[in-house]
């Protein structure tokens, strides 16, 4: 009889431990689910801040070595984009449109633009809406519109679309790829 009582005691203890384990596991799963839900809510409401960094500045006082002309490029939704345009020879050289990344301003790209000085190329770099003092807020559709506006501006100057090179850096790569299709 004593052995039976010991086995019953062990059985009840294991059953109680199993119940406690299941309860703790359920609590842990619920906590993890709740934290995951909070993360999703945070990402939803702060996604713009995570994607676009127009005020970040790692400008290192580079001096621009190429002659640029500051231009204003109108968009179809009445935003004027700041651009820097360098023209060597529209007839003999292709024109590169530089779509920059998700952080900083035009000044942050001076070191890259200086590499173009020895190339037989014209170029235009634009600042996205919300960047470099431009009005508006960056959105995916807005960036596509900015890119189309840059192309249209060059076409109005008499540049054939076949003579355009779309160059994207980081975020600008998506825009360049979209517009190249």
Model region roles, listed by residue range:
Residues 35-72:
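An N-terminal hydrophobic leader/cap segment in hydrolases
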Residues 159-169:
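Alpha/beta-hydrolase fold nucleophile elbow
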Residues 80-153:
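Membrane-embedded segments
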Residues 168-172, 176:
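Gly/Ala-rich beta-loop-alpha elbow adjacent to hydrolase catalytic centers
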């Amino acid at each position: 009889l004593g052995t039976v009582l010991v086995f019953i005691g062990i059985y009840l203890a294991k059953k109680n431990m199993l119940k406690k384990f299941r309860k703790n596991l359920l609590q842990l799963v619920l906590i993890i689910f709740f934290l995951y839900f909070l993360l999703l809510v945070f990402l939803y409401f702060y996604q713009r801040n995570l994607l676009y960094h127009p005020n970040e500045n790692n400008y290192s006082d580079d001096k621009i070595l190429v002659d640029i002309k500051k231009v204003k490029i109108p968009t179809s939704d009445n935003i004027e984009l700041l651009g820097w345009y360098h023209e060597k020879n529209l007839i003999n050289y292709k024109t590169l449109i530089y779509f920059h990344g998700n952080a900083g301003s035009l000044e942050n790209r001076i070191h890259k633009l200086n590499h173009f000085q020895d190339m037989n190329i014209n170029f235009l770099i634009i600042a996205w809406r919300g960047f470099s003092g431009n009005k508006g807020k960056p959105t995916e559709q807005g960036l596509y519109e900015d890119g189309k506006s840059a192309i249209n501006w060059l076409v109005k100057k008499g540049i054939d679309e076949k003579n355009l090179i779309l160059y994207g850096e980081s975020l600008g790569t998506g825009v360049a790829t979209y517009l190249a299709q």
